Design a protein with these regions (language model features):
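An N-terminal boundary/leader segment
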Residues: 1-46, 53-56, 266-272, 443
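Short helix-loop capping/hinge segments that flank enzyme active sites or metal/cofactor-binding pockets
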Residues: 65-87, 240, 295-347, 404-414
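Immediate post-signal peptide segment of exported/extracytoplasmic ligand-binding proteins
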Residues: 51-68, 235-243
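Acyltransferase
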Residues: 15-23, 49, 99, 256-279, ...
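Serine-dependent amide/ester hydrolase catalytic core
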Residues: 8-12, 24, 303-397
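Structural helix-boundary/capping segments
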Residues: 107, 160, 164-251, 262-271, ...
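Residue-level signal for inorganic ion chemistry
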Residues: 25, 44, 219, 243, ...
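Short glycine/serine-rich loop/turn segments
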Residues: 64-206, 246-248, 361-380
């Protein structure tokens, strides 16, 4: 499938139209097991028909008028139940209003195909869901492999060509991880960049939103639409772009992940980028803080879900999710206060350390693991989840916007990813840099 920008260009030229694009998406979605929790076909057809009429009249609402997209089932859509991937919410009241982001993209003319699957309550980086099924990674041709999570269905919906864009959320890596494992672009915004009104939360300090796409230009276009901007972006030369390659973690990642990243670095250097290879003291200190004092998201997720854990509905939770939530029940408040205090200092330290550069790391240390052993073995699930989240958690803790880009494949054809990150609030600069980096890697 082409990206959303190319699809919209076809609408403008008359080579295709939104109704045709939607029907293809609905057909593919209906034949893709466990990718969607629900389809919003009636709404989508109304939106597509209206968009097609606007294109015929030469009056599109935006460059993406009529482009189909999917929403992780944490976003409220009026008339639909927001399940959060949890069995106990199957019969929750339907949302009365669209989430703020849903409304903005709807007013730009985009067509909402449905709501995608996810790890229950968005609380795993692997994407397994025993209630609604686990979406299969499209690259797992030898045997079923994990999609990555928690935005599992959103990633697979794009990677499998059902839709060109799907919205996700990211608290510890939930956009960036599935993007890397499915060969996509995944953009985690700074937590305050978009309104989270109408989005089911996990950890208020760390939750962020963003798209999974097939190109950086599509991610930039979504960012513009969510800020009610209309502009066209052209990749600038990467010459002079400063990057810091975090060397300290490279020994810990799979050879294919490391080799593909280093190959990308050589391409960028050849194109004129200034790449400094060294350990990042702030990144390493953040890894150490998480290891020693625990994950801020664990404190906040327990506080949010304690009423659920203390209710009869807790019996309906995936036991693995329930155990992970319960593990934070006994954590002392002093530990939380310490993490928050150090976090603030590290955020300022990062700004000073990078001094305008972009941090470059692997997104995930490995390619997508085989699914069956993780379904069968609780200990393997826990250790693999921690390993999968390890390299994205520091960026989340420091609220760093991040863009995961495809960096290549391993010998089996499984995707690897690299991660570009910047200090909190520097999303626009990061996205421009990602567009330039992508243009080099694609050539």
């Amino acid at each position: 499938m082409s990206d959303a920008t190319s699809m919209a260009e076809d609408f403008a030229s008359g080579r295709s139209d939104p109704v045709q694009a939607l029907e293809q998406a609905l057909d593919s979605a209906s034949r893709s097991a466990s990718v969607f929790i629900s389809l919003t076909a009636e709404r989508a057809r109304r939106e597509a028909e209206a968009a097609a009429a606007r294109w015929r009249a030469g009056q599109p609402l935006s460059a993406f008028d009529g482009v189909p997209l999917a929403w992780k089932d944490l976003f409220d859509m009026a008339g639909s139940i927001t399940t959060a991937g949890a069995a106990y919410r199957r019969h929750a009241p339907a949302a009365s209003l669209d989430a703020s982001c849903v409304g903005l993209l709807c007013r730009a003319g985009m067509v909402s195909v449905g709501k995608t699957n996810l790890s229950e309550l968005a609380y795993s980086g692997l994407g397994l869901n025993p209630h609604f099924g686990t979406p299969r990674n499209p690259y797992g041709t030898d045997q079923p492999r994990i999609p990555g999570g928690s935005s599992s269905g959103s990633a697979v919906a794009v990677a499998a060509g059902i839709v060109p864009i799907a919205m996700g959320t990211d608290t510890a890596g939930s956009i960036r991880i599935p993007a890397a494992l499915n060969g996509l672009v995944g953009y985690r915004s700074s937590s305050r960049r978009y309104s989270r009104d109408g989005v089911f939360p996990l950890a208020h300090t760390l939750d962020s939103l963003g798209p999974l796409t097939r190109s950086v230009r599509d991610a930039l276009a979504i960012d513009d639409l969510l800020h009610d901007r209309r502009q066209r972006h052209v990749a600038r030369s990467v010459k002079g772009q400063r990057l810091v390659l975090e060397h300290g973690v490279l020994a810990e990642v799979d050879p294919a992940v490391r080799n593909n990243l280093l190959r990308a670095v050589e391409q960028l250097k050849a194109a004129g980028a200034r790449v400094e290879t060294r350990e990042s003291p702030t990144f390493q200190a953040t890894l150490a803080l998480i290891k020693r004092h625990g994950w801020l998201g664990a404190f906040e997720a327990f506080a949010l879900h304690q009423p659920l854990l203390d209710s009869a509905d807790a019996e309906q939770l995936d036991p693995r999710v329930r155990r992970r939530l319960e593990a934070a029940r006994s954590l002392p408040a002093s530990q939380l206060i310490h993490v928050l205090d150090v976090r603030q200092r590290l955020q300022q330290q990062l700004i000073d350390e990078l001094d305008g550069a972009i941090l470059l790391t692997p997104t995930v240390a490995h390619v997508a693991p085989v699914l069956a052993p993780l379904e069968a073995d609780d200990e393997l699930f826990v250790s693999t989840n921690l390993a999968t989240l390890r390299l994205t958690m520091p960026g989340s803790l420091l609220d760093m916007p991040g863009v995961s880009l495809p960096s290549g494949r391993d010998a089996q054809g499984l995707p690897t990813g690299l991660l570009l990150s910047a200090p909190t609030g520097e999303d626009a600069r990061l996205l421009r840099a990602a567009l330039s980096v992508e243009s080099v890697l694609n050539n």
